[in-house]
Each structure stands twice: as structure tokens, then as C-alpha cells.
Amino acid sequence: MVFWIAGAVGLAIAYLLGSTPSGYLAGKLIRGIDIREHGSKSTGATNVLRTLGKWPALVVLLVDVLKGVGAVVFARWFYSWFSTLSSGMPPTALDLQSLEPWAVCLTGLAVLLGHGRSVWLNFTGGKSVAAGLGVLLAMSWPVGLGAAMVFGVALAISRIVSLSSMLAALTAIALVCGLEQPLPYRLLVIAGGIYVIARHRTNIRRLLAGTEPRLGKVA
């Protein structure tokens, strides 16, 4: 029972970390606006770039990436700490060491959900791309680096952030399935990639219609 309660607390902390609305706070602090009422209505770094400028967008991007990194680092620390703590408790049928990848998987999903559906913003938010990159880099840096490189190349060619983000998500799925990664990590990347792409439904419709704005243009 203690194990499941501790796990639920850890997931709640990861969700709240992801829910920290960095883009929304940037809009309020810099211009006193609700960024959800401007541009693409998203709180992500791309809309911050279009609405507030380059430097606020860079700060928001870094903060969102660090949210993903922090969630995975926290999950590993919390799990290690709890495993040490539970060593003095009566033995259980659970193999705590083998469950660590699952803890990382669920924590990664929690931070992505928090970023895209923030409890502080009536369950609105960003597209979870930057937070997802942070999760990838902390969980398996080769997968994260590969996804980031594809994003950079696609953005340089197309100048379309949404397209580049979805290609990066698909790349992450391909890499995590092609490389030797634990099953929970594979499931996390597949579920997270599908979630990120699903968050781009409106962008997909605009891409098909040829109306998706390129970087530097107003949404």
C-alpha cells in the first residue's frame, strides 16, 4: 500500500511540474497579456516567439525542456530513495528494481499531460514538444538527440514548427524501437509521440490546406 501511495504522490508532483505554465507566465510578466488570446492560442515557445519575441521564447523553451528533464531525474531519485527506505520494511512480492523503468515511463507521461493540460490554465496548455524533448534527453539521450536533429533539419528546410515537431516525434518512435531500450521506455515514447501528434490536430488540418504559417509569420 505504501508503495502505491508513494507512486501516486510522485506522479502528482510530476504532473504539477509539467503544469507550470511558463509561456502563460511570460505573457503576464512581460506584457500583461493572456497569451492564449493571441497568435495560435498556445502557451508553447512558438507562440511566445510570435507574440513576445525571441528572448522570452528562448527562456520558455529552456524552462519547458528542463521540466521534462527534471521529471525523469526526479523519478529516478524518488524511486531510488523509496527503494532504500523500503529496504527496512517487511518484504513484499514486488521487485522494486525491475519497476524503475515503469516509474520513469509513467512520470514522463505525467509531465507531458501536465504541460498540455495544465491544472492552472483550466486544462489548456502547449503541445508538449519541448517537455517531451526534455524527457527523451534525460531518459535516453541518443533518442532525444536524434529527434532534436531531425527537428532542426526539418525546420531549416520547411520553416514550419508543427511539421518539424511531428517529424521529430515519429523519429523518436523509430529510434526507441530500433535501439535496445527497455519496454517501458518504448511504450512511453510511442504513447508520448502519439500524444504530441494528436495535440497538433489543428496544425495538420492547416498543413493539408496549405495555410500553416511558417516561422516568422503571424499564426
Curated annotation (Swiss-Prot):
Spans traversing the lipid bilayer: 1-21, 55-75, 93-113, 135-155, 160-180
Membrane topology: Multi-pass membrane protein
Any one GO molecular function term: acyl-phosphate glycerol-3-phosphate acyltransferase activity
A single cellular component GO annotation: plasma membrane
Subcellular location: Cell inner membrane
Keyword set, alphabetical order: Cell inner membrane, Cell membrane, Lipid biosynthesis, Lipid metabolism, Membrane, Phospholipid biosynthesis, Phospholipid metabolism, Transferase, Transmembrane, Transmembrane helix
Top EC category: transferase
GO biological process, any: phospholipid biosynthetic process
HAMAP family: PlsY (MF_01043)
Family: Belongs to the PlsY family.
Function of the molecule: Catalyzes the transfer of an acyl group from acyl-phosphate (acyl-PO(4)) to glycerol-3-phosphate (G3P) to form lysophosphatidic acid (LPA). This enzyme utilizes acyl-phosphate as fatty acyl donor, but not acyl-CoA or acyl-ACP.
PANTHER family from the UniProt entry: GLYCEROL-3-PHOSPHATE ACYLTRANSFERASE-RELATED, INNER MEMBRANE PROTEIN YGIH
Subunit structure: Probably interacts with PlsX.
Protein name: Glycerol-3-phosphate acyltransferase 2
